[in-house]
Amino acid sequence: MEELVTLSITQLEELMKKKLIAAGLPQEAASETAKHLAIADATGVHSHGAVRMDYYAERIAKGGITLAPKLSFEKTGPATGIFHGDNGMGQYVCNEAMKIAIHLAKEAGIAYVGVEQTSHSGTMAYYVKKAAEEELIALAMCQSDPMAVPFGGTRNYFGTNPIAFAAPRAGHEPIVFDMATTVQAWGKILDARAKNQPIPENWAVDETRSEERRVGKEC
């Protein structure tokens, strides 16, 4: 018989940090990643929370993530540049890149920072909200592996390519918008898989485009 265990967000964050450190991540990267995942779960975005831990641990074990990346920023203009992530942990890499973007925007009034050589970066909302909390308007976009089927198609071709936006509000929490360009984010399917639940008919297609045969198939 399964036993339901209830954890506080702080406890969950600490457990994830310990697991990431045990997998080989340095303290700083593990702490930032665990914080990111815990906030995702705390805000109801379970598709990008603790459910991702096994995937990350597997990627680390297979050498798919650089444990101690040599991060660098290449400035291409007064308020633009490329942040090189050296294939480090996505949440850690992108958080460092956002720090630079915020600094440049405060200096110049506007900024653009591209990030290359990184891994799965979690929720885009996490980064744009940081900028909004610094009284800045932010837009973040990210490509992904091809998972989306074009209209009328039967094969994956486009990425989910998430887009996020945030803006500050006086005396209130920032406005934050975060979406995938597909019917649902891939993480929602992972979440359903972890819970052994079927997915709605219109979330995915098979090679025949049969909606009736899709239910739960990808889970």
Q: How would you describe each model-predicted region?
A:
Residues I21-G24, I39-H46:
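N-terminal and secondary-structure boundary signal
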Residues H48-I102:
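Active-site cofactor/substrate anionic-group-binding motifs, chiefly glycine-
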Residues A148-E211:
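Phosphate/diphosphate-binding glycine-rich loops and adjacent basic-rich segments that engage nucleotide
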